[in-house]
Each structure stands twice: as structure tokens, then as C-alpha cells.
Amino acid sequence: AAFLLRFRGTAPAAALFFLALAALAFLLSVILKWAPSANGGGIPTAMGILRGIVTFKWLRTFVGVIASSVITFFAGMPLCNDGPSVLIGASLGRGVNSLLGGKKGAAWDRYVMTGCAGAGFAAATMSPLTAVFIALEEIHKKFSPMLLMAVFSSVLSATATTRLLGELFKVDTAFF
């Protein structure tokens, strides 16, 4: 508080700036306490989720990753887009599978989550082949024809959607 009082008379904008940063930091801490799985790197967290090491609630993780990414972006912190995109994809994969019933078992759940994580990486980096290799080699560590089909279809859908949205809104796909 004494630090902010020193700026009171000379630079009120600087004091307001530091207060805004403190408010954003507090909001970020509240979000990360509410959704602890949204903390840290997205790719290692997604790998832990798929291997059963990390437990998470998909909706909290989805909202927490998006909210914390937006807050850190507006606070001026550097943010890489591939990690959050992979974690958003994995949480959406779990959410879609659970909303549609999830009766096909744990293996199908992991296939859907792996495909969606690969789709998130493909949409973030616009490199579909790399996304397929990341999903198969790094995230899942196993190979099966069903997994290959799930990952390929998800990655191709994400790439096509990103490019179509770029053409529709006349925006370079690097901004998505």
C-alpha cells in the first residue's frame, strides 16, 4: 500500500495501472482455485488426464482455461496458444463424450479426448500433420487404427474449420 501511495501525487495513472494488475492477479487466483486443473501447461496436463494421473472436471477446466488465458492476455503477459488449446480440446472431448452418454467405455473416452486435443493443437498452430504426431506419439503413446481415425478426423475438421472461418471473416488464420 505504501508503494501505491508514493505514486498518488505524481503519477495517478501508474497507481491505477498497478491496482488493475493486482485486481487481475486476484481474479486469476480465484479462477485457478476454482479450477486447479487449468493451472500449468496444457499439454502435460492433458497427458496426465489421458493417462489417469490427473483428475479433472471438464466444464471447470474448460471455463478456467479460457478465462485465465483471456486474463493473462489482457494483463500483457506472454501466452502461447498451443497449450491452452490442447487442454481446451481435451476437456471438450470429455464433455462431449459425457453429454452424449459416455457408454462406450474408458478407451473410447480417451480416443475422443486425444482427437480433440490434437484438434486443439492443429487449430492453434495450423500444422495438421504435427498435430497428428503430437496426439499419437506424445499424448497417447499408443497406436491403433481407431485412434488414428479419431485423431485424423478431429485434426482435419479443426484445420478446415479454422481455414473456413479465416476466409469468412477475411482474417489471417494466425489470429484464431
Predicted regions span which residues?
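Alpha-helical transmembrane segments and immediately membrane-proximal extracytoplasmic
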Residues: 1-176
